Amino acid sequence: MIIALDAMGGDFAPASTVEGAIFAAKESKHKILLVGIEKILVGELLKYRGRYDLKSLNIEIINATEFITMDEHPAKAVRQKKDSSLSVCARLVADGKADAFVSMGNSGAAMSAALFYLKRIEGVLRPAISTVFPNFGGHCIIADMGANVDCTPEYLLQFGIMASLFCEKVASVENPRVGLVSIGEESTKGNELTLAAFELLKKADINFIGNVEGRDIPGGKVDVAICDGFVGNVILKLGEGLTEMMLKLIRKEFKQHPMTWASLPFLWLAIKDLRKRVDYSEFGGAPLLGVEGVCIIGHGSSNGKAVKNAIFAGAETAKHNIAAGIKEAILRYNNKVV
């Protein structure tokens, strides 16, 4: 696979993105197109010449004269900065020169670039950022995670169809359980949006199990959780905060109780495994479902490991040709209800 990486996007770019590209190139056969200001990227790569044989790595620098910052207006920046690293990445996919593009930068701009250059899949109303959230049984897919803070019932319906397909094909979950995030399990619970979406999801050709509450997501009751982007982003950020709090509390308790220190070598293995299960860098990035092509949006504070895994996520998503499956599923539903 050929993956275009927005090397200028992210809080720690280009250091983190170049490091991630090197990690990905060393651990796979994927070709990495490092897109950004050439002079800067060459300088970053040369920092690794003592540790790696750079000539053996399948990395190519694609020059872009501009980049989009985190605080710029997404759509405006994409329209005005046509030679930004992000725009160049999206065009590489649109022109068939890359199988996917990955960005750790301005998520709104990444979505705008995908819509502008890749276009929406026929029949899709709005694309959704579909992220992996750890739970008791393994992982849950949440859609939407922030692309659409205001939604219609029809948007949520399509999020369910797209995320269910992604969960089945890419995450290899057979007949994934799809739940609608609400304030109670009963079908009568919720607001106008969720009540209307509930009725639509019942008619979809997916394994819709009804309403689920926030606690059901980490509890492992569902494989796919559907919500608007406002709720999804709150869930994600709350989960990150709770994880950090729990790990800090564990460290604090150990410091306050010296008698437990003898067990630390044994408990550390469990804590290490726990941290790995909930660490966002293990998942890399979230696919933008609903566009003609593969766009992976990563965390702004991603390190090299997260960038590497986002590249792998892009390659895996591209391998399964999710866009074609989504188009077929949306068309099948539309024909069913006509």
Swiss-Prot record:
It catalyses: a fatty acyl-[ACP] + phosphate = an acyl phosphate + holo-[ACP]. GO terms for molecular function: phosphate:acyl-[acyl carrier protein] acyltransferase activity. Its EC number is 2.3.1.274. It comes from the Bacteria. It holds the Pfam family FA_synthesis. InterPro entries: FA_synthesis, Phospholipid_synth_PlsX-like. It is found in: Cytoplasm. SUPFAM superfamilies: Isocitrate/Isopropylmalate dehydrogenase-like (SSF53659). Keywords: Cytoplasm, Lipid biosynthesis, Lipid metabolism, Phospholipid biosynthesis, Phospholipid metabolism, Transferase. Homodimer. Probably interacts with PlsY. Belongs to the PlsX family. This is Phosphate acyltransferase. It comes from Endomicrobium trichonymphae.
